[in-house]
């Protein structure tokens, strides 16, 4: 008897939810080690996953090193044209740095369109003055062209959201490859060339992502968030390379993403109702391409690098993670038919199952911490076995996290840094007690936002008034 495909996703989620309820019951009904069953289950899953990711990262980095060691092969075929879309709403302070980086590219984009989504901080006026823009009125929107930089255009319209702005942008685009870029993302000089090479080398490549390093504004808590997010991003992008080598990558950062225009058009563009339009689009492209019998590949391009603004305050961090997780939940439930579905290759067979577990993983982690505190404060008791497990897990994480930073540096071609290794040790030892709790809280808030079907977008930075409030990232 074949289990109905439409029920596989809900059944797996129900099983994970049922286990959560049972382990919470065990924390009050049982004694001994069984009282912290929820923590042991979480640690077991996290241990297996981390081990798999680090071993697989070693394989991915070795492959990358072998490719870099080979002499470059001559390219005889045509290379794709590139349109770069820069999304901007009240980004007057960061847009100049972004555009300077685009002008400094070793292989500039054939076309750059700044999508001004109803900015009220003078973004459009600054572009007009800085780049000698002249406008052609188009209904309520305006299209401007630069006399100083022929490749640069601006599409200025009333505020309608990022997804709608991107849809206007790619429909205006003339390039065969469309790169989407946030206005606070600063590319390294070879980033566009790396994207162009990636699409030229792989005709099946439908979506590609760059590698980003977070830069935090200058605030009282900036050092804290810069420290932890640096290692979070490094591991996260390395893990994406792992999933890409197994043909099951579903997460590409919209702050620096690239799409083959024909694939984007076939999928119908970005969903204006999604809280995470980039993540939702990747799922839809996978679904449509597999259904059509022409599955695309999704990759991370290691040499397409850049920096991006990251939250530097507790409130902005929690707002960001709440929106991300609420969007993740909504997207996963929307495409639940892909869960455990061989029709969608390894994405359906494995990745969608992993993501089903991830829906409740932060709840498991936070509940495990609460139960542990309860055992200590109410029962004044903790089995020696649990203490040993926690210590062993910290040592395990310490070694593998430090080694993953070594692998990340090799993968990115960064000179090996002893200082970074030592910092990674400090991050590993302290992250579970501070930063990880903030991440899990953001995910729980995401669940609440999803259940209420309501979430407000909040800017990470104050709207520009005069002087920048952050350290400009260097490319």
Kindly label every feature range from the protein language model.
Residues 263-266, 274-299:
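A short, conserved alpha-helix in the catalytic core of glycosyltransferases
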Residues 100-158:
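Acidic donor-binding segment of Leloir-type glycosyltransferases
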Residues 178:
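Short aromatic/hydrophobic "clamp" motif used to bind/position activated sugar donors
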Residues 24-60, 74, 355-451:
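Membrane-embedded multi-pass helical conduit in multi-pass membrane proteins
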Residues 80-83, 111, 265, 280:
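Cell-envelope/extracellular polymer assembly enzymes that use nucleotide-activated donors
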